[in-house]
Amino acid sequence: MRDLRSLADDLATTIAEQFSTTLQAVDREFGVFFQRLFNGGQASLRTSDDPEEPGIDIYARPPGKRIGSLAQLSGGERALTATALLLAILRVRPAPFCVLDEVDAALDERNVGRFTQALRELTDRTQFVVITHNRATIEAADMLYGVSMDDGGVSKVISLKLADLDAERERAG
């Protein structure tokens, strides 16, 4: 029984250490991506002080604003903050792919440019599937897939590799 308690204690210590190390790394990257996406400002992650509701609190201060909760941010600011957090996690713990569904919908053209540049930084380890209607995001893609419906109600899928399109334009040009 004593060995079981010792094992459980060791496991709890290891989990706490790994959580703390990972949280610190994600927090650091979150701040970096936040500043890049907002062209300034500050963001951080902190463990909750409330023992009855443990968790992680997100603090964000876009340039020219006070630090506050996500609820105080505009739709575009929330989208960029969430994107900064996701990209920070992917930088620390890469995933083979990530699907983003219209995360750029609330972004203006300048912010879409920062968003696509940030995605591009991680494409060496993570493949992004971005569902979008935003022309600037589409133009930043390597590969496009389009879905349309014909008159008979049948969906058609088209694909286009943008590098091939650019090469074809150069030959025709």
PLM regions with names:
Residues M1-G173:
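Terminal ABC-like ATPase head and other globular end-domains that cap long coiled-coil arms
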